[in-house]
Swiss-Prot record:
Transmembrane segments: none annotated. This is Liprin-alpha-4. Residues 24-332, 426-470, 864-890 form a coiled coil. The gene is Ppfia4. It comes from the Eukaryota. InterPro entries: Liprin (IPR029515), Liprin-alpha_SAM_rpt_1 (IPR037620), Liprin-alpha_SAM_rpt_2 (IPR037621), Liprin-alpha_SAM_rpt_3 (IPR037622), SAM (IPR001660), SAM/pointed_sf (IPR013761).
Amino acid sequence: DVSSEVEVLKALKSLFEHHKALDEKVRERLRAALERVTTLEEQLAGAHQQVSALQQGAGIRDGVAEEEETVDLGPKRLWKDDTGRVEELQGLLEKQNYELSQARERLVTLSATVTELEEDLGTARRDLIKSEELSGKHQRDLREALAQKEDMEERITTLEKRYLAAQREATSIHDLNDKLENELANKESLHRQCEEKARHLQELLEVAEQKLQQTMRKAETLPEVEAELSQRIAALTKAEERHGNIEEHLRQLEGQLEEKNQELARVRQREKMNEDHNKRLSDTVDRLLSESNERLQLHLKERMAALEEKGRLSEEIEKLRQEVDQLKGRGGPFVDGIHSRSHVGSTTDVRFSLSTAAHVPPGLHRRYTALREESAKDWKPAPLPGVLAATTTPALTVTLRSPMWTRMSLGAWWALRLMSSHLVAILDAQTLAMMLQEQLDAINQEIRMIQEEKESTELRAEEIETRVTSGSMEALNLTQLRKRGSIPTSLTALSLASASPPLSGRSTPKLTSRSAAQDLDRMGVMTLPSDLRKHRRKLLSPVSREENREDKATIKCETSPPSSPRTLRLEKLGHPTLSQEEGKSALEGQDSNPSSSNSSQDSLHKGAKRKGIKSSIGRLFGKKEKGRLIHLSRDATGHVLLTDSELSLQEPMVPAKLGTQAEKDRRLKKKHQLLEDARRKGMPFAQWDGPTVVSWLELWVGMPAWYVAACRANVKSGAIMSALSDTEIQREIGISNALHRLKLRLAIQEMVSLTSPSAPPTSRTSSGNVWVTHEEMETLATSTKTDSEEGSWAQTLAYGDMNHEWIGNEWLPSLGLPQYRSYFMECLVDARMLDHLTKKDLRVHLKMVDSFHRTSLQYGIMCLKRLNYDRKELEKRREESQHEIKDVLVWTNDQVVHWVQSIGLRDYAGNLHESGVHGALLALDENFDHNTLALVLQIPTQNTQARQVMEREFNNLLALGTDRKLDDGEEKVFRRAPSWRKRFRPRDHHSGGMLGTSAETLPAGFRVSTLGPLQPPPAPPNKIMPEAHSHYLYGHMLSAFRD
């Protein structure tokens, strides 16, 4: 195999490099040895010279001494000194001779090693040459095989073409034969029909002759016949009128049926999305649980190993204690002095020299150090009164010369330190085992709860699917929902329905009887903890369990939002007598998992030992607000309220109930009345009460139902709402999605500015109402406003008719970006948020990673700015430019596709779907020319005719339908006229984005970068070349989206 040969070659290459490196090291060592030998030989030669010189000098002195008989004592001493030096030099010479012999032996050894390495290197080179030859052979075989494969593919292609041609001919022959047979059958049938018609005409002729005779006989009664005929004509006219009315009624019924079918398709799509999110949620929960379980098991293993190590240390301590006792008996006064100084409080860290440190066992030192660090880090116990005083004394320097005294003192010191640390650490071992066991039990119980929640979610999905497919919703009536409105899941938060926490942080609230549990169900309490759910299962009978199971299937997960950490604070306030151990374990549980801030309420009842695994559940609840089923919630007075979406779903359930529509209208009218009263009184937003704020969130902002329920429980006035920062919105209301928080913050800021007494009148229209729904907008469009303050409440910046439904279902498809619809709907992006989306928001939350698509979205936003976010004006201009080339700025993606088809490029028009090409991009983007459009259409470069047609028609389109003009230069690049820049001057960050208010009115948590406007792209001096991208070869980005 080629891959195995390549791996062999790589291995041989690495082996060759390794041998080469070894060879270099050996040569360096050889060179150093040779230098050392040379030095030693030089030193030896010098020593020989000195010895010879000294010997000559000694001989001369001896001759002089023989001639002179009188010798002084001074020359004798000099001769003795020279003799001692000669002996010293001879010893040095012998030492150097010995070193030289050793160097020569080492040189011989290194030479042998070099020889072996050279032989290995030669072998490796031969193997490498063989491998290269084998690789070349395999490559030649591979090229031959590829050539044979190409020949076979060409033959197969030729045979396939012949087969297709023969098949087409056979098909055409069969079609012709069938056509002729059909024509023959038609002719025969026509012939028979003509014969039958002739016979029928003959019979009619005979009948007519008979009638003629009868008519001639009845000619006298003609006036009576005429009167009867006139009566029949009048009756026929009335019947035709009734028939026309019936046809019109049928058309209306067909329209309603089509609307219902569309609504059913949307419901099915929402259910499919909910199933996907449930699946992702369950996968995330399982992964988090498995990781947490693994971490705890590993922690338990480490702790058990530490306990075993401590047991072994205790045994060693016993041995050392016996040794210390023996040393005390032999030590004498020195050891007694050390112990006396130790008890007085003089030493704990002994500094000793290197010679004395050699007597300390290294393993014992490591175990002691680890034990001391672990004890100091994990346990931190209080000092015991009976422990030896050696643990609290400063340093002592011990310098000992005798090995026996050194062993005795160090042994006593180690025994003292190990005994003290072991006595401190062994006290918490059993407590640690109990804590770990409790954590494992909590994790196992959490896993069981999650599995039960998954089963209940599957039951809900199946029940919803059966109800949607069958179309019978009669089983869900209001009476049953009021009797059974509980959701027995741990996803609900106690703070949404109750203002007081349970009485104990560790105990579980218990119901005294079955009737009490049923009373809770009737009242619509949807926030029972999971521990309470277990007691309810024990109390309720099997019949009531079946009823609860049916009720669970009818209520979506969206009705039970994740609890906020506010319940944790309530828990802490309610239990000031929590033990220190519980508080410590709670802090450890929180620090170990930062994502557990949204943990459920029942985890607090376990002493905060379980990790919060529901932090990602909030993603499930922001998908689609229209897909909510029945949701019972309680307001501050305790009354059961139903939202608009619930009532709209209840309408087709029971046809016999006529009060549902009236109830819906009454509640909707009441909510609109609250907002209308606040508008007419001119009340600032800070003075609004809780019901008005909740109605504003539900009717105008369009927040999901469980967000509204969270605000109903936590926000009691407009002042509280306007003072919420970004972190407080996430913590108090439980909105984890950053874009959901941005939506709410922008709505709050806009309302604060609109209701401010110093707010300027709006510029879009002098008559309008930001508080009306889409239906009321149509009915109130022609009505006159009598209030003088109506202008300040216009829908200039409200965008009530441009909510996230319009953005996802109409605006994004008009830009050619329908593939991002689900992400925009999930993040509840409305027109108010468009000008505040950053590049990070588009990439992370909206999954718009294509730079060309972000550019397309930005020019779509610029188009809305030019129209002052007027939806009716946009639709009007699009309708006017439907059948002619004008006002390209408002063209949709479908209109651009139709224009491409009309210029004769129908084959390439399909490539514009989901491309992001729309009229605003053509009219405003100076870098978008005919070459870029040809790249998007995927017109081949060799098709010059199609590209010429595209260039000519594109220039005509820009000249007739846009403000871009053609430069006089050679490149003929279209550029915008300078007039539009005056209309789009960059605004400073203090303008408050689209709302036009001061940034000082923002709450504390507002981000200026988020609320800052997106600047229009500056005109570059040179044309930006298109860049290769995942979908298209065009990718320049706006400056506001650059990092």
